[in-house]
Each structure stands twice: as structure tokens, then as C-alpha cells.
Regions:
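Mid/C-terminal beta-alpha module of Rossmann-like enzyme folds, strongest
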Residues: 72-116
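Short, amphipathic alpha-helical "lid/cap" segments that border enzyme active or binding sites
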Residues: 35, 59-67, 143-147
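Conserved beta-loop-beta element that borders a ligand/cofactor-binding pocket
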Residues: 1-22
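Amphipathic terminal alpha-helices
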Residues: 142-159
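Conserved C-terminal active-site "lid" loop/helix of NAD(P)H-dependent oxidoreductases
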Residues: 59, 78, 89-92, 114-137, ...
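Glycine/proline-rich active-site loop of Rossmann-fold NAD(P)-dependent oxidoreductases
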Residues: 18-33, 42, 47, 59-60, ...
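A short C-terminal helix-loop "cap" of Rossmann-like NAD(P)-dependent dehydrogenase/epimerase domains
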Residues: 34-46, 99-112, 129
Length: 159
């Protein structure tokens, strides 16, 4: 490995789908598009059945995980950063966000030609066992993380 070959002290973090108020205007990921629409009071639009299952982690939890890895991780090891309680399909993610924002989920399914550019990954779930062995635990469920995100980005958190 690189660590052994060059005698460096390094650890690796493999982040799952990280979400939160850190989303940028140029972010084109589906979850960022859902969030922008929900904040605008518009329906969340799915471009697929939303059956793909992913691990999610709220940005504040991910930051804490990175700190745990930096302080306690073993050199040469890789750690999955994921919340084992926040595994959901894209549709479940969208429905949770829509419910919190008071909007609906609608579908705009692409043509076969358009679908060719879409991801074919159906399951992207990470196990955070090694990270949890360092003592790290997430503080936010998917719903809590989305609720905090909406409050922060809408300015409610400042009131």
C-alpha cells in the first residue's frame, strides 16, 4: 500500500451520500435538486422509480466521523463513513424531505434514450463497523438531518 511504500501515516475515509446545509448551487446530484425544489415550495420530482438504495450521512455527523478517523484511526486503514440507521431508497429520501417541506413527490420518468445516462447502481450501502469501533456514533437520523437542513437553509434556524 501507499502507506507502507512511502512510510507515511495516513488513513482513508470513504464517505457515503452526505447531505445537509452544505449543498452548493452547482451540485447536480438528485438529493441536492430535491432540496432546492422543496425549499422553493415546489414538488420534489423523481426521474426514476427511486428504488436505488443508499447509505446517507448528515454533514455534521460526517464531520464528526472524519475527526474520529483523524484522531483515532489506524494508519493504513480505510473507514466507511455512513449512518447504519439512514439507509433508504431515493424515493424514501424524497418522500421524507417532501413531507417535512409540505410538498409532494411527483414522477417525470425519462425516455429510454435519456435513461442511458443514468446510474445503474441499485444499491450503495456502506457498513460503518470499523468507524463505530473507534467510538463514533451518528447523532442525526435521516429525518432529523433533513429537518435541520431545511431549517438552516430557509433561515428558520436563525430565528
Amino acid at each position: 500500500s501507499y502507506v507502507r511504500q512511502y512510510a507515511v501515516d495516513a488513513v482513508a475515509a470513504r464517505l457515503c451520500y452526505t447531505y445537509g446545509p452544505t449543498v452548493t448551487p452547482g451540485n447536480s446530484r438528485a438529493d441536492a435538486q430535491f432540496l432546492r425544489r422543496a425549499l422553493a415550495g415546489e414538488d420534489v420530482v423523481l426521474k426514476s422509480a427511486g428504488s436505488q438504495v443508499r447509505s446517507y450521512c448528515y454533514a455534521a455527523d460526517a464531520a464528526g466521523a472524519l475527526l474520529s478517523i483523524l484522531l483515532s484511526g489506524a494508519s493504513g486503514e480505510a473507514y466507511n463513513v455512513a449512518n447504519r440507521e439512514s439507509v433508504a431508497s431515493i424515493r424514501e429520501y424524497a418522500e421524507t424531505l417532501a413531507q417535512l417541506a409540505g410538498v409532494r413527490v411527483t414522477f417525470d420518468l425519462p425516455t429510454d434514450a435519456e435513461r442511458q445516462g443514468y446510474s445503474v447502481v441499485t444499491r450503495a450501502v456502506q457498513r460503518p463497523d470499523k468507524l463505530e469501533a473507534l467510538g463514533w456514533r451518528p447523532r442525526f437520523s435521516l429525518e432529523e438531518g433533513l429537518e435541520h437542513t431545511l431549517k438552516i437553509l430557509s433561515g428558520e434556524a436563525l430565528k
